[in-house]
Amino acid sequence: MNQETTRREALLLMASGVGALAVVSAAGAHAAAPAAPASHGMMMSDCVTECEKANRACLETLRYCLETGGPHVAPSHVRLLLDCAEICQVTANFMLRGSAAHAIACGTCAEICERCAKSCEAFSGDSKLAACADTCRTCAKSCREMAKM
């Protein structure tokens, strides 16, 4: 074996070990957590769904805004759409893996969704942006409830 082959094998082993450790760690953390009431699981599942809907709505609205141009591509508006899409996906991921920090993520997500909704509502008469605002408000409401858990 040459030195490069040994190095490559070591890197592969470390990468697979880190992935396996993360899975074992996540499984261990989940197993150690106290059982949540069934209603908590349903609420969390609903919140994940709302986060995924808001993520998609923001990304689709961003595409629409980029195609429309003009005031629709104001940097502050584009940043909020991106921020909202990303925090919604991250928050859904926190809940899906049973993170103990999901309430923190949900609180932040609710705040960003509200800001995004206000930014979208500023474009009065635009049905695409109004729909995005509605979706973000629904997500914000669901996340506020989960943040209390």
Label the model's feature ranges:
Residues 15, 20-27:
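Amphipathic/hydrophobic helical signal segments and adjacent flexible N-terminal regions
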Residues 50, 62-138:
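Extended, low-complexity, charged alpha-helical tracts
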Residues 1-18:
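N-terminal secretory signal peptides and thylakoid transit peptides that target proteins
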